[in-house]
Amino acid sequence: MSYPDDYSTDIEKNKMDLKEFKEKTQIAELESKVLRLELKNKDISRENVQIKKENEILKRELDKLRIPPLILGTILDRVNERKAVVKSSTGPNFLVNLSQFVDPDDIVPGARVCLNQQTLAIVEVLPKEKDYRAMAMEIEEKPDISFEDIGGLNNQIRDIKEVVELPLKNPELFEKVGIVPPKGVLLYGPPGTGKTLLAKAVAYETNASFVRVVGSELVKKFIGEGAKLVRDVFKLAKEKSPCIIFIDEIDAVASKRTESLTGGDREVQRTLMQLLAEMDGFDSRGDVKIIAATNRPDILDPAILRPGRFDRIIEISMPDEDGRLDILKIHTEKMNLKGVDLREVAKIAENMVGADLKAVCTEAGMFAIREEREFIKMDDFREAITKITGKKEKCSYDMPQLTVMYG
């Protein structure tokens, strides 16, 4: 059987088209495979780069771990630009070289440095040492008490503002008049009259740093510890300048010096002498203000009371009737009162200080809660005053020296 020539030609053409289609399909598959391999290669390259980076980081960490520790030392003297005398932490003194990475201007007597173990060369200068106890005395969060929250102490608030707040906020006023701003104020008076409250209000009203110290914290067991802590507190205050240092219960460390031979008294006297030197010594105190509080001014050492250390001594006395009324208004502002005459309460609450009046308000509220009432009436305040007065008389003890002091 024979086929036409045209039919044979079509078969040959179809075979060629099929072959060409297969070749194109193979090429497309190969190109797709190449593309996948290229993408995979890029992913592997990125992973390789990431692994190399991690490897470098781990190598650097290992190198740091392999570096031997450095020896701590203190500069005693600088001989020239590249040599210094150092007292090492191991004991002996050495004449050592300075590393090229160390600035010679940083090498001053007393500076802390790091020494290489083998050559003892100075390789790093450390920042000044700070006592963690002094650092902990700085108040980061300001108290939420303002002068408006203090009643019956208008004259005292004015005096403390003039001494502490005004020099920090408007120093140009003192420059125009030509006087040096006061440096410190001593608050004294019976317990509960608001001495610590005034210091909290000063911390709230000013933007200065605030360092709070209790006098007993400066009294330490071992020789020199208390004096060192005093130095560190004032050093911290100068670094944080403008700053206010509040020393509560200062009589714990600033009592009159005697001829006592006990070791504890001698250490307290050393701490006091360091405090006197820091308050008004050879070095300027800078923009650092001091507020101190005590309820025993009669036992304070005369040296600490002189001007230059405490330029103003403010008595926080017992509030009068108007003062007690102001205090009661502050403490009863959010209380649900019904038929209460605060003037009458202030009149019958004689010889009570601010802390007593706050306790009276709390007790009056407790009486209302006990009787399942949602408001406080006048009888609650009368019962509260009777309770607080009776508690004070029961816990009182004779202190004849205070009678003269507070009148």
Swiss-Prot record:
Q: Which InterPro entries match?
A: 26S_Proteasome_ATPase, AAA+_ATPase, AAA_lid_3, ATPase_AAA_core, ATPase_AAA_CS, NA-bd_OB-fold, Nucleotidase_PAN, P-loop_NTPase
Keyword tRNA processing set for record = no
Q: Disulfide pairs?
A: none
- Which PROSITE patterns does its entry note? AAA
Q: Where is this region: Docks into pockets in the proteasome alpha-ring to cause gate opening?
A: 405-407
Q: Which GO terms describe its biological process?
A: proteasomal protein catabolic process; protein unfolding
Q: Name one GO cellular component term.
A: cytoplasm
Q: Name one GO molecular function term.
A: ATP binding
Residues where ATP binds: 192-197, 331
Q: Name its cellular compartments.
A: Cytoplasm
Coiled-coil-forming residues are 22-67
Q: Provide the alphabetized UniProt keywords.
A: ATP-binding, Chaperone, Coiled coil, Cytoplasm, Nucleotide-binding, Proteasome
Pfam name, any one: Prot_ATP_ID_OB_C
- Report the superkingdom from the record: Archaea
Family matches, as HAMAP family: PAN
What UniProt notes about the protein's domains is: Consists of three main regions, an N-terminal coiled-coil domain that may assist in substrate recognition, an interdomain involved in PAN hexamerization, and a C-terminal ATPase domain of the AAA type.
**Assembly and binders:** Homohexamer. The hexameric complex has a two-ring architecture resembling a top hat that caps the 20S proteasome core at one or both ends. Upon ATP-binding, the C-terminus of PAN interacts with the alpha-rings of the proteasome core by binding to the intersubunit pockets.
Family membership noted in the UniProt record:
Belongs to the AAA ATPase family.
Functional summary from the UniProt entry? ATPase which is responsible for recognizing, binding, unfolding and translocation of substrate proteins into the archaeal 20S proteasome core particle. Is essential for opening the gate of the 20S proteasome via an interaction with its C-terminus, thereby allowing substrate entry and access to the site of proteolysis. Thus, the C-termini of the proteasomal ATPase function like a 'key in a lock' to induce gate opening and therefore regulate proteolysis.
Question: Would you tell me the protein name for this molecule?
Answer: Proteasome-activating nucleotidase
Q: Which organism is it from?
A: Methanococcus maripaludis (strain C5 / ATCC BAA-1333)
Q: What is the lineage of its organism?
A: Archaea, Methanobacteriati, Methanobacteriota, Methanomada group, Methanococci
